[in-house]
Amino acid sequence: KRQALLPYAKTRLDLNYIIGEMIAELACGHAYVNPGEIKGPERIKMGLLGAELNRDKSGFYRIEKILPGAIYSQKLRSPLTEPGLGVKEGDYITAVDGIPTTTVDNIYSLLIGKAGVLTELSINSTPSAKGARQVVVNPIDNEYPLYHYNWVQNNIKKVEEATNGRVGYVYIPDMGPDGLNEFARYFYPQLDKEALIIDDRANGGGNVSPMIIERLLRRPYRLTMSRTSTKVGTIPDATLVGPKVLLINKYSASDGDLFPWSFKANKIGKVIGTRTWGGIVGISGCLLYTSPSPRD
């Protein structure tokens, strides 16, 4: 019945739409078609400073908030926190590459194409061009990783303060390499906590949840202690023996959807939140010679 639409398909996007309609009739998750032979326009990347800015009545821009970054990851680099810059919240940006911000409608018009390009900012502690100093920054093209990182850090801080440091918190963004790395980064330093909150909300899926479940299922059968220490170790190593709970929501998807089921089935702890996405399908697929990739 979709054949009748083919004469009207003039572009690859039209054909992909028809294929998508066919796939929709399967009522199956993880089934879609990738674009194929489509040339997109070249994107001009906007330079971003990892900060929240507000325009002062003077026309200069006040730095309301600087997003902290993390030195262990390039994608968590926050431009205004680079060593030696001395830029603080409350400072003003009076010019970009020598062009006063008072001469433009929006400061970001001066940052078009500046991502990854060394850019000079004029910084002052007052909303005035007089006395401003110049610093050179390297803008980024995406602030989402910084916002996400700070959201996680705020969650850790909330749990720390609410429990007097007794309970740990681990957020797992997906079930791929990034999610596994994040689990390892935050799980192992908190093995001495009395309990653990694992956050699976908005988990983007992947395939490593069995590895995490295996780690959470570990039970010590022997304890160790150094002669001059009061710290107790476990055999097997890296075992957190306290209670655990798992947070979920409707955006916990794919393997991030299977993870809470496995958590509950293995009686690791309570699952708290709203019903998950409900789309657990293993995917594979074959490439067509014209490049689009139907997945099933």
What is each residue range found by the language model?
Residues G20-A27, A31, E64-I71, A184, ...:
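Amphipathic, well-packed alpha-helical segments that form the structural scaffold of globular domains
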Residues R43-T103, P177:
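PDZ/PDZ-like domain segments forming the peptide/carboxylate-binding groove
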Residues Q3-R62, A129-N155:
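Extended, small/polar residue-biased N-terminal targeting/export presequences
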Residues Y289-D296:
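Conserved small/polar residues in nucleotide/adenosyl-binding loops
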